């Protein structure tokens, strides 16, 4: 394995491989033998669906994975981008019919209770398996849904500081873990950002306290590249990042949140731009412009020293931050 001397984690996130027990085990064995921890992706674990697809082996696999691989098996990457799918693709939101009387609270309740009706998620809970996923919106609500670890997307034309503020703030107040996954910058070749920018994204994430930093290495480009989309220069950047961490162990988490922006409770706004939707059912409302304005001011002022959370009595901000800003206050 090319990266075994300068990484410690392998995420097996392949739909086709996840349908092949032998391939899954062989790849996991290979990664663990190389000294890496493993996280394994499954797109579904509901028994009825697995029976129809002849994939019931996944359930017995769950019950033995921790015993077989021990501490090297970190958990299961279950589904993918639940928040993004809800806001952008109607894959989940179509399960809920909004009416003229529907409120943000109603939709938040449906979204965060999805796992209660997912027998696959219950299988993970029953086996005390840590549950991971990645997303690019609604991190706060993904954690409320029950996920233990969220990987925030980095690499798109998002503001990395904003995504860190959202995922770290949610993880901090809800006592969860977080990370980033460096994904595509382009929907076309060369897909990944430059090695220099990928290095900076990894460093910024790690410095801000990310527990996991991952590179999404897919598909194959150019043709014949046996290492996915990563170039030799990307591997050099990854090795440099690893060596910089080893030499500077105090770097992790050295950039801490000094301030927090508190958003309205259950305000499921995508926040990627001023025109983003709210819970897939509503256009921006009267609060959106005000939130966007103060958000830009605070990101400029604090950068990665800012967290973003939601007003929720179950997770008070008082005592956790030096400076607290509310969405509807004016900054002079």
PLM region spans:
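Glycan-processing catalytic domains of CAZymes
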Residues: 1-332
């Amino acid at each position: 394995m090319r990266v075994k001397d300068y990484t410690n984690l392998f995420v097996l996130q392949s739909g086709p491989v996840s349908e092949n027990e032998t391939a899954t085990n062989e790849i996991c064995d290979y990664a663990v033998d190389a000294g890496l921890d493993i996280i394994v992706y499954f797109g579904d674990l509901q028994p009825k669906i697995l029976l129809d697809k002849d994939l019931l082996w996944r359930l017995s696999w769950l019950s033995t994975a921790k015993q077989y691989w021990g501490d090297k098996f970190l958990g299961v990457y279950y589904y993918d981008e639940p928040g993004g799918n809800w806001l952008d693709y109607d894959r989940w939101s179509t399960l809920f019919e909004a009416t003229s009387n529907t409120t943000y609270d109603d939709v938040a309740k449906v979204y965060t209770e999805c796992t209660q009706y997912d027998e696959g998620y219950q299988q993970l809970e029953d086996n005390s398996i840590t549950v991971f996923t990645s997303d690019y919106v609604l991190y706060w609500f993904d954690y409320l849904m029950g996920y233990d670890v969220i990987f925030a997307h980095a690499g798109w034309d998002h503001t990395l500081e904003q995504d860190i503020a959202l995922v770290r703030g949610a993880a901090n107040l809800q006592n969860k873990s977080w990370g980033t996954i460096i994904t595509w910058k382009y929907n076309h070749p060369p897909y990944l950002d430059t090695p220099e920018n990928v290095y900076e994204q990894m460093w910024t994430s790690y410095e801000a306290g990310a527990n996991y930093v991952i590179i999404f290495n897919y598909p194959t480009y150019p043709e014949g590249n046996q290492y996915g989309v990563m170039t030799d220069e990307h591997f050099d950047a990854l090795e440099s990042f690893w060596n910089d961490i080893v030499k500077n162990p105090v770097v992790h988490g050295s950039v801490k949140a000094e301030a927090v922006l508190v958003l309205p409770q259950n305000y499921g706004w995508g926040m990627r731009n001023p025109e983003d939707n709210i819970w897939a059912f509503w256009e921006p409302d009267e609060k959106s412009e005000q939130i966007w304005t103060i958000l830009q001011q605070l990101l400029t002022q604090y950068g990665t020293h800012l967290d973003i959370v939601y007003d929720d009595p179950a997770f008070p901000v008082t005592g956790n931050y030096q400076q607290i800003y509310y969405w509807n206050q004016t900054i002079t």
